[in-house]
Amino acid sequence: MAKVAMIVPKEKMLTLAKPMLDSYSNMHVVLLECVEPEDSQLALKIAQDALAQGCELIIARGVQATLIKHHTSVPVVEIQLTAQEVGGELLSMKEQLGLDCPKIGLVALSNMVGDISRLNELFPVELREYYTDDRDTLSSAVDQALADGCQGIIGGHAACKRAQELGLAYHFLPDSSESLRNAMAIASRVCYAMDLK
C-alpha cells in the first residue's frame, strides 16, 4: 500500500478530509497537515521530510502543489475545484449582487480550478476567468477584473483582500468535500498502479 501525504491550506479542508480517508483502501495516509497558503516554503519542507520517511505520493493544492512538483521527485495529485463547487459560488454571488446577469471574475492560480468551460451556459452570469501561475500577481488580476467591469470576484485570500480594498464584492474559493474526494480518488488509483509494480 503506497504511503501518501496530504497537505492542505485550510483547517476546514483537513476536517473534511479526515472522515473520507477510510474510503480509499489503496493508499495509506502517513501525514495530514494544514499549512497556511502564505507559508508555502513550510509546505515544501514538510513534503521533503515526508519523502525522506518513505512517502510515495503527495496530495496538495495551489501554490503548495506547484512548489512540491518543482522541487521534489514525488508524484503530486492536485486538489482542483470542480464546476459544481464554482457554480455554487456563482449562484451565491449572483444572489448577493441582486443582478439578473452579473459579470463575475474568478481569480485563482491556474492549477486550482478544473474544467469550468461551460458554466456560462449553465448559469445566468457572465463568468470571466483570471488565472495566474504566480501568487504575487493575484492582486493585479483583481485590478484587471475590475477594469473589465466585473461586479464581484471569487478568489483566494490574496484576491479577496484586494477586492475588499477596491470595494468590490467577493466570495472566497469554496472548501468543500467534492474537490477533496476527487483528488483522493485520483491518488487512490495512482497508488493502486504503484502497488501493481
PLM region descriptions:
Residues M1-K197:
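Non-catalytic structural scaffold of enzyme domains
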